[in-house]
């Protein structure tokens, strides 16, 4: 095989030129710089430069800021008008945006850390609104969950899974993280969750985001949490925790209806339930049951069935509708797989919680911008809107390109027959 070398400067990541153009045309640089404190005259790079450089690392196939230095930097610096900071500057800029952690002590005397970054949280929603991914005249479904992020940092702690790390609480709308608070790895999911949700709902109201429905697992099944959720949305759906009182009521149910949910048949029923005492407010408990696999009798229900309950204030919808709606939260849980493996949540760069919180929110913005890009390209039939970032890179980003000068004009030359010039037109 004969080989010849060429010194011609070809950028193998030509698609990033079009991503940068969208970034500028949408006004994201000015939004970012306006929303965050200025870096001052002594800094060569603005936060908008730092943000897009970090995002570009993911869009080009990297997973950390150091990839800018070792793999992509020279190619990115060849793009006219793109100021590309080094990895050190990118990381230093994120550290500047860190907020002070809050320390609380539980009734059992255990200290918990929580990191609330209001400027970054507000910017996340502003970016999503700017992209058209969130709108003021829509009632959204909110999913809330905690995600264990395994890591060994100075302030990471052992979780209940016996894995060291952080345990952030994350609000999700339409497959996007929209609010993030970082927490100690050992913190119980219910510990001060009502305060986290109250802050999230307050921020949503300030940004004009309406929450119509809330959907949560049994980690949100407590009186304080339910009161906060009910006060801030129209209807909620929370997985109920079984207890002796609930099982007593289930035994009294005589009318069950057989319904096909997904690919399986279940028996379903609804009852009025007072989870916090007969003198408190009653809710609707939607129950499903199915035979267990081993046929073993349950001591309390006196049958060989598996029971599951959903607590809700929705008295109008059919049981099947409520169950299918709740089961759809599995799609929201897949968001964590995407954030972990495509946008760096499984590789936290800093040694302190507050700095890693900035990173989590910044990469959530990166994910939101990516969602905007692929949905727009999907309308031009480049690919499906739900593709993972690896296919996006292969299908759009990795194309040979070169900036040339003709008639005193800079022209981007693409070595492909694909109509890149029409991609976002």
Label each PLM-derived region with a short phrase:
Residues 10-31:
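Conserved oxyanion/phosphate-binding beta-strand-loop segments in alpha/beta enzyme cores
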């Amino acid at each position: 095989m004969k080989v010849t070398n060429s010194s011609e400067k070809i950028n193998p990541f030509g698609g990033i030129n079009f991503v940068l153009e969208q970034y500028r045309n949408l006004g994201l640089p000015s939004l970012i710089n306006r929303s965050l404190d200025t870096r001052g005259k002594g800094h060569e790079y603005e936060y908008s430069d730092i943000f897009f450089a970090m995002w570009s690392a993911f869009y080009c196939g990297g997973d950390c800021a150091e990839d800018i230095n070792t793999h992509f930097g020279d190619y990115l610096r060849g793009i006219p008008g793109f100021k590309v900071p080094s990895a050190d500057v990118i990381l230093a800029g994120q550290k500047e945006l860190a907020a002070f952690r809050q320390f609380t002590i539980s009734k059992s005397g255990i200290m918990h850390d929580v990191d609330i970054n209001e400027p970054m949280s507000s910017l996340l929603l502003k970016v999503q609104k700017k992209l058209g991914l969130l709108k003021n005249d829509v009632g959204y479904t909110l999913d809330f969950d905690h995600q264990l992020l395994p890591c060994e940092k100075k302030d990471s702690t052992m979780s209940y899974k016996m894995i060291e790390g952080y345990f952030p609480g994350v609000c999700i709308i339409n497959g996007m993280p929209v609010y993030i608070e970082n927490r100690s790895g050992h913190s119980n999911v219910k510990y001060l969750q009502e305060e986290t949700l109250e802050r999230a709902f307050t921020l949503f109201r300030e940004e004009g985001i309406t929450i119509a429905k809330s959907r949560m697992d049994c980690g949100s099944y407590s009186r304080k949490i339910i009161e906060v959720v009910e006060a801030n949305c129209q209807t909620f759906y929370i997985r109920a925790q079984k207890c002796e009182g609930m099982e007593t009521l289930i035994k009294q149910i005589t009318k069950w209806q057989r319904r096909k949910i997904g690919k399986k048949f279940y028996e379903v029923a609804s009852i009025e339930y007072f989870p916090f005492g007969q003198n408190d407010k009653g809710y609707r408990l939607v129950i499903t049951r199915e035979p267990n696999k081993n046929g073993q009798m349950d001591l309390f229900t006196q049958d060989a069935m598996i029971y599951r309950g959903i607590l809700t204030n929705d008295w109008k919808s059919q049981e099947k509708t409520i169950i299918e709606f709740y089961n759809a939260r599995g799609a929201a849980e897949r968001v964590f797989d995407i954030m972990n493996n495509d946008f760096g949540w499984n590789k936290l760069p800093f040694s302190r919680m507050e700095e890693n919180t900035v990173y989590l929110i910044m990469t959530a913005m990166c994910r939101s911008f990516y969602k905007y890009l692929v949905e727009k390209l999907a309308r031009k039939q480049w690919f499906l809107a739900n593709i993972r970032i690896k296919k996006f890179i292969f299908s759009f980003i990795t194309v040979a390109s070169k900036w040339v000068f003709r008639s005193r004009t800079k022209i981007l030359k693409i070595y492909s027959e694909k109509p890149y010039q029409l991609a976002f037109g």
